[in-house]
Amino acid sequence: MNALQSAGRSIKTVGMVVAGAGCLLIFCAIAACRQGEPVDEAAAAGLTTTDFPQITADIFKPMDGGIELSSEEIMGRNAWILWSAGNQRFWDFAARDSYGLIDLLKMLDNRKYPREQRFRILGLMNEPGFRAPGKPDKFGLWLDDQVTPEPAGIDEKVYGKPSGVIGFRLFPNPEFDEQARQQWDGGRFMHDPAYYNNRKLVRPYRVGVACGVCHVAPNPVNPPENPESPGWENLASAIGNQYINEGKVFACNVEKGGFFYEMLAAQPRGTSDTSRIATDHINNPNAINPIFLLGERERIAAREKMAGGTLDLPGEENEMNVPHILKDGGDSIGIAGAALRVYVNIGMFSEYWLTLHDKLIGLTPQKPFEIAYARKHSVYWRATAERVGKIAAFFRRLKPLHLKDAPGGVSFFTSDETVMARGKTVFAENCAGCHSSKQTPSDVDPRSPEGKAWFRTAVNDPGFLDDNFLSNDRPYPVTTIKTNSARAFATNAVAGHVWDNFSSQTYKGRAPIEGLEFLNPFDQTHRTFKPRVTTGGPGYYRTASLINVWSSAPLLHNNSLGEFTGDPSVAGRMKAFNDAIEKLLWPEKRLGQGSIWRTQNECALQLRKEFVPAILQKIAGGDGCIKIGFIPKGTPVNLIGNLEPSVGQLAVLQAKITAALTKIHAKNLSSGGATAELIKLVPELLAANKCPDFVEDEGHYFGTDLSDSDKRALIEFLKTF
């Protein structure tokens, strides 16, 4: 059955769809209701933080260049790579109740993604000491075989056992009793959708997710010969995994033919959409942050005002200096609060978190995650709070990784000292005002002639790059930066939303952004856009750090600028850097409208029947999927992905979409004819779009007016960062 026939079948039952949609709304609202006062599993079991001891052994000694760490720093690195904070409960829940998308246990099975292809396909780091399995385990799963035991000191009851993939830990499922064992079939688990989409299916393992999943990656100055088989010495703890394929990792069950498949397929490698759960109704994946020079970031941090539930976090003050990690600066309450929020965002205390928002679809309004409630009712929260200070201590030890120290790195530098000297001057006069943590005196404007003279002297100091964060860590309006605005308009941290307690009053008081113009790719006109959220907070980007810029391409906050080589060797990184930096400084080389994420196939809105109310299950096809609508090939992904219609807009859209699909079916229109009919809906779709900014590689035009020789000189200096 082709897409148009499928659309036609949906149209014949459109009355049932409309009625079912109402049931679905009620169903989701009920599912999101808070019932009683939830506590986490550890609290329910009568455990305390003493039941979750920290690991004192230097488990990962060869990593990060073999640096010597204090006992506090060792415990911090161990927690960063191993501690899942009880989120195995959330990811097991997600496998049973994510509309047939998420299943981490299946993703780890070699029948889905073989170990010898894991880095290429998924971008994940295989754990040293494992090999591909030669036979299934006792549950019929083909998980990696461990050939070298983990170092002593890891309590599997607390940290799980290794899966063969760094950051993913396996815990016995407490619900896997004798009845569950009798119903378990490892073969059907992989191949039978009706079996593995059964909400009552109990898996033998829960999978915990540690921060290392997204942050451990090949060390640029000691890359593995084979990225599918790294040694511990080839890995860096917090550089940010710019190779991860988030869609395939966290939604391995997503099926072709559905819009969600197309949306994830368009997502750049090395990016993560941390506001997909809880959703902010903007598809805004962004590059995973590297973490370096935390001490310098603390030194230059600006003061921000705190209020409300934020002050329930121990150590918070009414006003304090705040370094940031998130691109938009929404994590504005200090290191401890920012780190704890990340753990919640990946599933800690999901018993409470999931009562505050409607996961994935977001049909019900969000409620704030209250710090005071978590402190009282979650042992995992308190155990994590005991760890975040040690994690921060470890971060303070992480230094930049220089090209000159990488194998063959010196061959990529110019030997012309005049060119290098000119590059320093160009940087001083055009870049350092934003991209340096060493700044002019407070009474000197860095953009003034006096400020530029100050930077010329500073940049030529041999110690200028030492402990320089290469950013002033200040937020600027997206109207100034002009990069794609989707991440800047994230709303989860605004007042009353899920991360309300984790953003400062200073963040919430930022001036709203107005006067935006975005390209309408359908008629090539520019339209004025007024953000729906008129309160303070969204609409800003922090200055990106240029630390390790030679190793971190593609560039920009969304990894949209430059070629993704998938090659962590020095040559592979430099190929990506050279392509990206040329496109940054010579914008005529960019893809422009070619960077718009588009559907590569005709598709439909698609849900597995097992995850919807009974009234909607009747319209599922033979493949078990409910397909509604027809989305043409080449549709901008974010035309659909960023929809957040008001009630009135939803009614208009529903009527017009129904009429269009009915006409397509009645006249048996071709794919081209159907596309032409659906294009008429674009004005309504744009009006209901929370961020209709579709061109991904735009913006940051600073320095593009330099001469070619100055640009080349600047590039040479950037390689030294």
PLM segments and residue spans:
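Periplasmic c-type cytochrome electron-transfer domains
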Residues: 3, 7-15, 27-721
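Hydrophobic membrane-insertion alpha-helices, especially the h-region
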Residues: 19-27
